[in-house]
A protein has these predicted regions:
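Short, ordered loop/turn segments at secondary-structure junctions
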Residues: 67, 111-114, 215-216
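RNA substrate-binding interface of SAM-dependent RNA methyltransferases
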Residues: 71-165
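N-terminal positively charged helical leader segments and presequences
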Residues: 1-70
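Structured adenosyl-cofactor binding patch, chiefly the S-adenosyl-L-methionine
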Residues: 197-249
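Glycine/charged-rich beta-loop-alpha catalytic/anionic-binding loops adjacent to active sites
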Residues: 16-18, 75-79, 184-186, 205-213
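Generic structural signal for residues in well-ordered beta-strands
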Residues: 62, 142-146, 210
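Active-site/ligand-binding-proximal alpha/beta "capping" segment
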Residues: 161-201, 208-211
Length: 249
């Protein structure tokens, strides 16, 4: 039996209404109608099992049958800040994989060597990717992708995390042991041009530990997935063989 289709809505009470793109997808693509059951999500971590009560021209009314807590969220808060890339598909890939791996907070930023800049439409697109990825991997929470105009702004947004990792291609060795992490963790990965020495110094002054991902130079999107995977495994989020570590932000 396949899992029920999942949709994000703004508000849920005893009833809920699907509108906009979610409605169009439910009605015109999935051909859902009266009597069909779905799962609605309001980004609170809860999952609402609902039944379609009526379908109008531009909306779908659903009655709530039951509510439960989602069980796919990571126990340890993890954040990823990445340098915004020129290639839109690569930015979407980073967001998609971060969501699939369980990241709670995502920040795109511009830095000294960045050659691409964000606008409202691009940010909206990344948030749509976040929601679609959350639905695909059965998460009950879709991280809101935020944009920081400077690296410093991004670093300051991550000050509440217990572990702060700064992936740096010219770091000779890691200042933190990413294999034995405990508690909430923030990661920062640069854009195509990487970071300057001054940016590394800034990060270090704000409590970030420089880390290396090995002797080979990785593409930015590869570095994001690699570091996120390492961190999630270290925190016990990718298998029973690693130690579970909880943290708060």
């Amino acid at each position: 039996m396949s899992a029920l289709k999942r949709f994000f809505v703004e508000q849920i009470g005893d009833t809920a209404t699907l509108i906009g793109e979610e409605f169009e997808h439910a009605k015109n693509v999935l051909r859902l109608g009266v009597g069909d059951e779905v799962v609605l999500l309001d980004n609170s971590g809860k999952e609402y099992t609902c039944i379609v009560a009526s379908v109008e021209k531009k909306s779908m009314l659903l009655n709530v049958l039951g509510v439960s807590e989602g069980d796919k969220e990571a126990e340890t808060p993890v954040a990823l800040a990445f340098g915004y890339l020129k290639n839109a598909d690569k930015n979407e890939f980073i967001v998609q994989k971060a969501v699939e791996l369980g990241v709670k907070e995502i920040i795109a930023f511009s830095s000294e060597y960045s050659s691409a800049f964000m606008n409202e439409n691009k940010l909206d697109r990344l948030n749509k990717v976040s929601k679609e990825s959350a639905k695909q991997c059965l998460r009950s929470f879709a991280p809101t992708v935020r944009y920081a105009k400077t690296l410093k702004d991004a670093l300051e947004l991550l000050q509440g995390y217990e572990n702060k990792l700064f992936a740096c291609e010219f770091a000779l060795e890691s200042q933190a042991d990413v294999n034995t992490l405990y508690g909430s963790t923030a990661m920062v990965v640069g854009s195509e041009g990487g970071f300057s020495k001054a940016e590394e110094s800034l990060a270090n002054s704000l409590g970030f530990s420089s880390v290396t991902l090995g002797k080979r130079i990785l593409r930015a999107e590869t570095a994001c997935v690699a570091l996120t995977s390492i961190v999630m495994f270290s925190l016990g989020e990718l298998g029973e063989n690693s130690v579970k570590c909880r943290g708060q932000v």
